[in-house]
Amino acid sequence: HPYSLPNSMLKELKSYPIAFQKAGESYAWKYLETFCEDRGKLYSRHISKPTESRKSCGRLSPYLAWGNISIRQAFQFVKNHPNYVHHKRAFNGLLTRLKWHCHFIQKFENECTYETQCVNKGFELMPYESDYEKINAWKTGLTGWPLVDACMRCLKETGWINFRMRAMLVSVFCHHLDCNWKDGVYHLSLIHISEPTRRDP
């Protein structure tokens, strides 16, 4: 590379957590290649499973979020891979989710208030308990519910859990702990590797 990195960035790279996916374009391509060569064949079967999804999912979200590769590059690579004909269902599952990514990004572009306001404005008036102790227990993985706590601790340690488990964390936060979703989303953005806002708390 013809340009040197600033010292501040080099310092941050040295402290990059070892349990996280390795950063950069070369690793983005490695994840794509290993998905198409082997990992992706069980994608459809493992997508919802907390443990198996760590291997069988595309794991492309950090590379897409940080701009290491584009949606188009990922889509074309998977669609044109020789194994596509052997694992069409699984590969099409990933391609569909790449399309969804574009769909939801466009929704945010069209209606950027989604980040801070309820889609259904009626929910803005809904009362929540939003108990600080419950919120803190959820954030630290100490709710007492094994799957919830395991997912939160895994997310904090590795920066990644599958979509279904992320959705489950938010559902528990809102419906079972009776907390306003706005009190939880920032925490998730701080610890998920795909979020450009991520900082080590």
Where do the model's predicted regions map?
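Glycine/tryptophan-enriched, flexible segments
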Residues: 1-122
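Acidic/polar loop patches that form or flank catalytic/metal-binding clefts of enzymes
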Residues: 43, 106, 163, 180-185
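Contiguous, well-ordered alpha-helical segments that form the cores/surfaces of helical PPI scaffolds
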Residues: 58-61, 133, 137, 146-156, ...
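Secondary-structure transition/capping motifs at alpha-helix termini
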Residues: 81-86, 158-161, 179-181
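Alpha-helical scaffolds flanking conserved acidic
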Residues: 89-95, 164-168, 183, 187
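Active-site core of glycosidic bond-cleaving carbohydrate-active enzymes
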Residues: 97-99, 105-147, 153, 163-167
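Secretory-pathway/luminal and periplasmic proteins that interact with or process carbohydrate-rich
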Residues: 104-109, 177-182, 194
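Single conserved hydrophobic/aromatic residue that forms the stacking wall/gate
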Residues: 191-201
